[in-house]
Amino acid sequence: MRLLDGAPVIGIAVEGDRREQEALAARQAAESLRLLGRANIDLSGQVNVMDDFVGPGYARPTDTMREALGLAARFEGLVLDPVYTGKAFAGFLSLARSGRFDKKQSLLFVHTGGTPGLFGYPEAI
């Protein structure tokens, strides 16, 4: 999916497979656009979700998620949870390290909250 200015949007799944999550994200985006008075916009094929960072399953920690939590906290003062934002940031870091983005390109990581999740998964951090 691309924002109105053409910037790509990449989702990182925390459960399910890529196709399932892409369909869900497309439905939710279409409904959001409808509520904003922008109905009849076809989003099929425009949602890009990666499922490489799900690991052993929903709310199951991964080594890359643990690394992402540590790096975000240490270098940015950013608190991530082990269920959603930790895995999402692990994906974000992986994409950046792989050279997927131009070094001059501005990037945005959308932190969706989840701090209370830290308290439910002390063994994950």
Where are these regions (language model features)?
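Glycine-rich phosphate/pyrophosphate-binding loop at beta-loop-alpha junctions
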Residues: 1-48, 110-125
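Short, intrinsically disordered/low-complexity patches at protein termini
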Residues: 34, 103-104
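Active-site-adjacent helical/loop segments in soluble small-molecule enzymes
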Residues: 43-103
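Conserved beta-strand elements of the Class I
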Residues: 106-108
